Amino acid sequence: MNILLANLTKMVGDSGGMAKVTCAFAHEMKVRGHRVSLVYSDVQTGDFYYPLDKDIPAYDIRHYKGKSISYPWYLKVKREFYRTFDKQKARTVNDEFAASFLLDHLKDVLQTVQPDVIVSFQPAASKMLLCDLQTKIPVITMSHGDPEDYFHTYPKEEIPALEKSAVCQVLLPSFEKHLKDHLPNVKTVVIGNAIPQYDVQADLSAQKDTYKILFVGRLSKNHKRPHLLIEAFAGLADEFPNWNVELWGAEDGKAYYKELQLLIKKHHLENRVFLKGPTNDVPSVLQQGDIFAFPSAYEGFGLALGEAMSMGLPAVGYKSCSAVNELIKDGENGYLCDDGVEPLKIALQKIMKNQNLRKKLGWNAKKIIRKYSSFLIWNMWEKILKRYSI
């Protein structure tokens, strides 16, 4: 097959989950003998954070054939004006920009690649392909979160592209229901994210001088919310003097990073809570951990959580968090707690004080996440691609 991946957003230097999935998808399908190309749209130029095989053509429609496209100032003003009272309407300006300035470049990519099937990474890309260009090439629209959001925060003009898609992939069964509730006739398939199945496992049986609670993810205030973990640990630090917290991930704005530093200082945890920055070796980080804390407000799937489970770490998250509340089975491979700092503290405390419980939860975590093995997930994807390709 000749597969085109259309992830029409940033890729350069991006350490986020979507960029990771994009490069993993491209690599896996190439290894399986398929031709793979990537089209993306990035303000910046440069190297990807996650390596892309040098034999996979990558086309940036913002910087295409010697021509760079800047976002016009008048559209920026228009977008910011709308954003003050209607974020959904503000996002329509991005679609307006794409349709006005990027469509010809995308059309040229299609003519160059001539794919048998296109995997679109967002409804905006599907809109450009199916509604604006009206391509007859089958488009499979991926979802990286709860599709319920499509009907509240995404431009309404993108919705018809979902119905025009050959099939819409969702990550979890509950997400399929959300999409079908709004679009009963849309074709759907449930395929989770591929989680590496590690041969090694965190050693939860060892007696250690220092035990670690780990957080891995972007340091974002309203999404990942690592400040809640710091606050929860502040109430546990004296009770558990041989436990520390490590926060791994790129900062998402200097103001919030400073806020985290001040919070650590406020609770006198400078020698107990550490901001470690991003890492290119997540498995090595996870292998040294004892508990994985994931205080997100929402998740599309939770790749970092899945990887922690694969390393055999018990996990703690919030009941209210989408995806997390499906990956964590309360009392089986970790704990789901009510919102707030105190419930998070109690859930962590329960695991911290009982090594046998940690071992049991960690073993179950590794077992439960096996259904998301890369082999099984990519097999599902390859089957779907073959079914809908020209």
Regions found by a protein language model. Give the residues of each.
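Nucleotide-activated donor-binding/catalytic signature segment of Leloir-type glycosyltransferases, i.e.
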Residues: 258-277
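A short, well-ordered alpha-helix in the C-terminal region of glycosyltransferases
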Residues: 285, 343, 350, 357-371, ...
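Conserved acidic donor-binding segment of nucleotide-sugar-dependent glycosyltransferases
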Residues: 319, 329-342, 350-356
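Short hydrophobic beta-strand element within catalytic cores of glycosyltransferases
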Residues: 314-318
